[in-house]
Amino acid sequence: KDALEHTGFAPK
């Protein structure tokens, strides 16, 4: 999992 998803950015 990317840390981006925690910041609100979901690459999926």
From Swiss-Prot:
Q: How is it modified after translation?
A: Glycosylated.
Which keywords has UniProt assigned to this entry? Answer: Calcium, Glycoprotein
Organs and tissues of expression: Nacreous and prismatic layers of the shell.
Query: Is this entry keyworded Calcium?
Result: yes
Q: Name one GO molecular function term.
A: calcium ion binding
Instruction: Keyword check for Metal-binding, yes or no.
Output: no
Q: Which GO terms describe its biological process?
A: shell calcification
What's the miscellaneous note? Answer: On the 2D-gel the determined pI of this protein is: 7, its MW is: 29 kDa.
**What function does the entry list?**
Calcium-binding.
Protein name in UniProt: Calcium-binding shell glycoprotein P29
Organism of provenance = Unio pictorum (Painter's mussel)
